[in-house]
């Protein structure tokens, strides 16, 4: 593989290093990391990072070096425009801050008549149009007309999970049992990248994955926190957590198959069917973080609960998981603090209305969430 291919990874945290950085370096690409966190940048500049790969057959560790590192606070438009692929690996709520920078890069590519692929790695759905428009706002009329000829913005489904003690940690674990999925690229060839497959059906599959995999995962995290556990591994073995999460998984699968008129084979495409030989140690706080986003109407727990309500299915497990999410407290998590503050001052019903967009048409679901919230709080 020639080293002429260059990927810029915007966000050098767990996934940025442990999945994207490692696999593109393995394939012989030039890899540049960009981040806003000084500790992340300084650690990477000091040498190398290591990834412990957990596959169904073996666990092995590999060290990586020979990459570039850049501070997003500096003027990085010049090095960034050398990339023919840009991977966005930041929190969804922070992506808008990249629009001016990506606009500069797109402007340069259009002037040079060079192709650029922008890959968006986030669990949030339906972002591609807004990201594309956000970038195009920094282009003139002629450049906007030429945009699609040279620039493509593609969605991705994150299935390859990673874990580290922090975003700045240089030792990362990667669960390499199922490939992540990216919308098929037209302008760059990434077929030699391990752990990634391309598909024309990402939009539909991403929603399915969010509900059927991330939903039960969140249920394990919030129930595990309630039980005083620290790792997802502990939660997966806890009877209380199992009851909630497996109930969420069973009902979610049923209502999603019915709502989208799917076959079970469709779900198999995004399921984690293989187990790692040695499971990675994952923290509950990593999975439970940002509860405002994860308790939103179109996200992993609330929407399947609404579908269950509409379809006449049992929504008790989802209601309990949502109640447990409302009980999640983390002094280092801004969203958790905001949610708890609003709950304290406005009550559960108003909180669900504001953050989960539940209204009088969902009254039975709201009542059930309130019931579980009050019962769980008593027993805490």
Place the predicted regions along the sequence by residue.
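Substrate/ligand-engaging "lid" and interaction regions
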Residues: 2-8, 14-380
């Amino acid at each position: 593989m020639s080293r002429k291919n260059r990927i810029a990874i915007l966000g050098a945290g767990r996934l940025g290093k442990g999945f994207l950085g490692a696999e593109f370096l393995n394939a012989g690409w030039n890899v540049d990391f960009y981040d806003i966190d000084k500790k992340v940048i300084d650690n990477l500049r000091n040498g190398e990072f290591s990834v412990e790969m957990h596959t169904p057959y073996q666990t092995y560790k590999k060290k990586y070096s020979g990459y570039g590192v850049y501070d997003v606070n500096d003027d990085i438009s010049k090095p960034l425009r050398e990339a023919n692929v840009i991977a966005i690996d930041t929190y969804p709520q922070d992506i808008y801050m990249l629009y001016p920078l990506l606009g500069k890069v797109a402007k340069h590519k259009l002037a040079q008549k060079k192709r650029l692929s922008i890959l968006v790695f986030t669990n949030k759905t339906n972002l591609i149009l807004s990201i594309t428009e956000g970038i195009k706002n920094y282009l003139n009329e002629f450049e906007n007309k030429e945009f699609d000829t040279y620039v493509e913005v593609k969605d991705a489904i994150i299935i390859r999970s990673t874990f580290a003690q922090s975003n700045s940690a240089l030792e990362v674990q990667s669960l390499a049992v199922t490939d992540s999925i990216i919308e098929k690229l037209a302008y760059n060839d990434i077929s030699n990248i391990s752990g990634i497959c391309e598909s024309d059906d990402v939009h539909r599959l991403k929603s399915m994955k969010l509900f059927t995999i991330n939903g039960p995962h969140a249920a394990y995290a919030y129930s595990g926190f309630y039980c005083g556990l620290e790792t997802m591994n502990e939660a997966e073995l806890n009877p209380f957590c199992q009851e909630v999460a497996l109930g969420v998984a069973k009902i979610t699968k049923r209502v999603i198959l019915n709502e989208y008129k799917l076959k079970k084979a469709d779900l198999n495409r995004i399921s984690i069917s293989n187990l790692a030989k040695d499971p990675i140690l994952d923290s509950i706080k990593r999975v439970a973080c940002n509860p405002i986003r994860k308790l939103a109407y179109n996200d992993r727990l609330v929407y399947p609960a609404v579908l269950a309500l509409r379809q006449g299915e049992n929504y008790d497990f989802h209601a309990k998981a949502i109640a447990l999410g409302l009980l999640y407290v983390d002094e280092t998590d801004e969203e958790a603090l905001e949610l708890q503050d609003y709950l304290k001052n406005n009550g559960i019903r108003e909180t669900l209305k504001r953050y989960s967009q539940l209204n009088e048409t969902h009254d039975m679901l709201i009542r059930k969430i309130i019931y579980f919230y009050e019962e769980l709080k008593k027993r805490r």
